[in-house]
From Swiss-Prot:
The keyword Transcription does not apply. PANTHER family: MUR LIGASE FAMILY MEMBER (PTHR23135), UDP-N-ACETYLMURAMOYL-L-ALANYL-D-GLUTAMATE--2,6-DIAMINOPIMELATE LIGASE MURE HOMOLOG, CHLOROPLASTIC (PTHR23135:SF4). This is UDP-N-acetylmuramoyl-L-alanyl-D-glutamate--2,6-diaminopimelate ligase. Carboxylation is probably crucial for Mg(2+) binding and, consequently, for the gamma-phosphate positioning of ATP. It catalyses: UDP-N-acetyl-alpha-D-muramoyl-L-alanyl-D-glutamate + meso-2,6-diaminopimelate + ATP = UDP-N-acetyl-alpha-D-muramoyl-L-alanyl-gamma-D-glutamyl-meso-2,6-diaminopimelate + ADP + phosphate + H(+). Its cofactor is Mg(2+). The gene is murE.
C-alpha cells in the first residue's frame, strides 16, 4: 500500500502546500503515478518544467518547482514555487518515507577505488554474522544476494530514500552504501543518516566533472561532515585520508586503518603474504592480533578487508569475530575473479580496474606471482576523463609483458580516437596489440598465453553490457573468457 502525507508536513512554510495530500515525490515525469507530487528542478539536459504536461497526464496532484523558470518555459497555474527546492529534497524525502535510514545501521563508503568491493564484502560479513544486510551501489540496490541494478553508483536523492524505505520494509537491519563524489556534489545523499562513514583512497578519476584533484577531494570530504555520524573509518596510508582524519569534527570516533604501520592507525594488517590462491595477514587491533587467511586475490584487497574490519570494530565487534569473518569472505563478481589455471591453461583474471591507480594496483599484485608473462587487455571509456587514457597506457606498459588495447564502453565517442589517446601514452606503441573488438582481443590474449602466464582483462568487471553509440549490447568479460577457455579445453580433448 502506498504511503500518503499532507504536503504541508514537508513544506510547512509554503502556504500553497496546504490542503494537498501526496502519495509520492517524483523527479522523472515518466515515473509519476496518480497522487504523486512532481518535482521540477534544473537537470543536465533540461529543466523539469519542460515535462509538466507529461507529469499531469500521469496523475500528478502537485507541481513543485525551483524558480526561476528557464526562459521560454511557461509555468502552469497552481504550480508551487519553492526557493532552494533541490537543497530541501533530502529532508523532504526522508520525512515522507518515515526516516528509513535511522531505522537501520547505515555505512557510507567513499573513495576512488574499492567502494564496490568494500560495500559488498561488508554486507557479506554482516550476513555471516547473522545480520540481515543490504547494499546500495554500482551493482544495484537490494538485500544481500538479491540486488537489482539501478544504473547509478548512488541513486538520485528521491529514489535513494525510496530504496532505503523499501529495504527497511523488507527487514534490512544494516545497509552498506557506495557514496560517489558525484552524489555528494549533487546532494543525492542529503537527508541520509549514517552511523559510520568510510574513506578508501583518492586517486585520479572524474576530473572531467570536478576539474581538479582539490575539488574532487573536497567532494569526497563532504560525507564526513554529515550530521550525526558516529564514527569514521579512514585509510591513513593515503595522504588525503590522513588530512581527512585530522580534520574530523570533535566527538566523532576516529578509526584509522593501515597496512604500513602508520602511527595514527587503530586497525592494521601486518606480515602480509600474497599468492594466486589468496592473501594472508595478521589483523592487529591495539595490542592484540589474529590471523586472517582469505581467498581474495591482490594486495589492494587487504585494504578492502581492513576497511571492513574498521567498520566492524567501530560497531564494537570483537577482534576474534572480525578475523574469523574476514577469512570466510568470497570474491565479488568482476573484482579479481580468477578463471582457468588447470590442465595447462593460463590463469585469467577479470577486474573492474578502470582508473590509473586501480590498474596499477591490479598489475602490481599479479606481477609478483606470475612465473611467466603478465598479459593485459584494457581500454578506456568514452565521454569520460581523457587525461587518464595516456596514464593507463604508461602503467600497462610498465607492469605488463604484453598489452592488448581494445574497446571498453566507447559510448558516443569515436573508438579510434579513444585508442589514439591511449597509444599516445606508450613509449613503444608499435609493440602494442590493438584489437578494438573486445571479444577478439580477449580470445587473442588467452590464445597466446601459456600455462605459466596470467591474463588480466581489465576495465569492465561486473558489467554485462558494452555501450556503443548510446546502445548497450549484451557483453560480459567473464563469460567471454569462459567460452575461450572452454574452447581451448575442447581442442585439447580432441587432440
Amino acid at each position: 500500500m502506498r504511503r500518503s502525507m499532507p504536503l504541508a508536513q514537508l513544506l510547512p512554510d509554503i502556504p500553497q502546500a496546504r490542503d494537498v495530500v501526496i502519495s509520492g515525490l517524483v523527479m522523472d515525469s515518466r515515473e509519476v503515478q496518480p497522487g504523486d507530487a512532481f518535482v521540477a528542478v534544473a537537470g543536465f539536459g533540461a529543466h523539469g518544467l519542460c515535462f509538466i504536461e507529461d507529469a499531469c497526464a500521469r496523475g500528478a496532484v502537485a507541481i513543485l518547482f525551483e524558480p526561476p523558470a528557464p526562459q521560454g518555459v511557461s509555468v502552469p497555474d497552481g504550480a508551487i514555487a519553492v526557493h532552494g527546492l533541490r537543497a530541501r529534497l533530502g529532508a523532504m524525502a526522508d520525512r515522507f518515507h518515515g526516516h528509513p535510514s535511522q531505522a537501520m545501521t547505515m555505512v557510507g563508503v567513499t573513495g576512488t577505488n574499492g567502494k564496490t568491493s568494500t560495500v559488498q564484502l561488508l554486507a557479506q560479513a554482516w550476513h555471516c554474522l547473522g545480520v540481515r544486510s543490504a547494499t546500495c551501489g554500482t551493482l544495484g540496490v537490494g538485500l544481500y544476494d538479491q540486488v537489482v541494478p539501478t544504473g547509478f553508483t548512488t541513486p538520485l536523492v528521491l529514489q535513494l530514500h525510496q530504496c532505503l524505505a523499501q529495504l527497511r520494509d523488507e527487514g534490512a537491519q544494516a545497509v552498506a552504501m557506495e557514496v560517489s563524489s558525484h552524489a555528494l556534489d549533487q546532494g543525492r545523499v542529503d537527508g541520509v543518516h549514517y552511523d559510520v562513514v568510510v574513506f578508501t583512497n583518492l586517486t585520479r578519476d572524474h576530473l572531467d566533472y570536478h576539474g581538479d584533484m582539490e575539488h574532487y577531494g573536497a567532494a569526497k570530504a563532504r560525507l564526513f561532515a554529515h550530521q550525526d555520524v558516529q564514527a569514521a573509518v579512514i585509510n591513513v596510508d593515503d595522504p588525503f585520508g590522513l588530512r581527512l582524519l585530522h580534520g574530523l569534527a570533535k566527538g566523532m570516533r576516529r578509526v584509522g586503518v593501515s597496512v604500513c604501520g602508520h602511527t595514527d592507525a587503530d586497525v592494521m594488517a601486518q606480515h602480509l603474504s600474497l599468492n594466486l590462491q589468496g592473501i594472508g595477514f595478521d589483523l592487529v587491533i591495539g595490542a592484540d592480533h589474529a590471523s586472517v587467511r582469505s581467498p581474495l586475490m591482490g594486495r589492494f584487497n587487504v585494504d578492502n578487508l581492513l576497511a571492513v574490519a574498521g567498520v566492524l570494530y567501530a560497531l564494537n565487534y570483537a577482534l576474534s569475530e572480525i578475523a574469523a569473518v574476514l577469512s570466510t569472505l568470497r570474491p565479488i563478481h568482476g573484482r579479481m575473479n580468477r578463471l582457468g589455471g588447470q590442465d595447462g591453461q593460463p590463469v585469467v583474471v577479470v577486474d573492474y580496474a578502470h582508473t590509473p591507480d586501480a590498474l596499477g594496483q591490479v598489475l602490481s599484485s599479479l606481477s609478483s606471482h606470475v612465473c611467466g608473462r603478465l598479459i593485459c587487455v584494457f581500454g578506456c571509456g568514452g565521454e569520460r576523463d581523457r587525461g587518464k587514457r595516456s596514464q593507463m597506457a604508461v602503467i600497462a606498459e610498465s607492469n605488463a609483458d604484453v598489452v592488448f588495447v581494445t574497446d571498453d564502453n566507447p559510448r558516443g565517442e569515436d573508438g579510434d580516437g579513444i585508442v589514439a589517446d591511449i597509444l599516445a601514452g606508450f613509449a613503444r606503441p608499435n609493440v602494442v596489440k590493438v584489437q578494438r573488438d573486445r571479444s577478439a582481443a580477449i580470445a587473442a590474449a588467452i590464445g597466446i598465453a601459456s600455462a605459466e602466464d596470467v591474463v588480466l582483462i581489465a576495465g569492465k568487471g561486473h558489467e554485462r553490457y558494452q555501450e556503443v553509440a548510446g546502445v548497450r549490447h549484451p557483453f560480459d568479460d567473464t563469460e567471454v573468457a569462459r567460452r575461450v577457455l572452454a574452447a581451448m579445453s575442447a581442442q585439447e580433448t580432441v587432440r
